[in-house]
């Protein structure tokens, strides 16, 4: 069976949305399952529903798995995404071939860091996205050099990218980027900005650049929420999907149908991003903190609240708990209490709480 690419996909008779050619508008540090099932899904919908007409270049932040870049490039950036779960009481198992990815580069391979810097000089580039794990946003003095190919840490790489852009456009204020951090730490955008400032100072970069980095660019803290199991582990299920699809897909991804992305940003940012017009579950808010509290206290809190009693009652998985009237009733009562206790606006309630 042939590997997925544009020609093979066309031969299967796939009739979903596909965008083959478009300028690269997004630089994404991270090529893992989560970003491809979450952020890249939103950009793909924005291409279809909002006419964004933009591609995403994936940059591997570490050198541990260079073959992933090879797999993605072999498939010309295409991969199959399955979103599964329950929505409005109905079972969902939706397939979509994601076509917003342009390619993937491992900057540790010969010549590939130059590709990253070339994109930094592009007029088309608008957005940087990152998910480099909780350990990715970190600064260690002396661990990365300005002329290193590439610098070691992710914040050092980003600082170098921003300096390349600053130099290419002679510090033009309108050439700054929107930087969306998805790492699972508090104030991820602010922490990333601090790290970049530390590297800029370590490297003795000029004050004019530091001013441009902090004022022309928008470092956004964000809250992400989607469960992403990733690859299908069952060989029989994988074989059945490949048979049904008519191709093999080494980058196939699976995520929960529920997903919400809350982006902390200034007035006007929502109009710069393509998501509002696309109608996807992405919000731009002045402060992400209350949204994070609601997520943790309602979604995570609900599970924590019933799991010990449910386990003692002989239940091992959440699905079975939700089929039990006693456990489900206890959880519903607890959710009502937390929903009423924490109010951060009607919109937030509707995104996370079933009681609105």
Features from the language model and the residues they span:
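Substrate/ligand-engaging "lid" and interaction regions
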Residues: 1-349
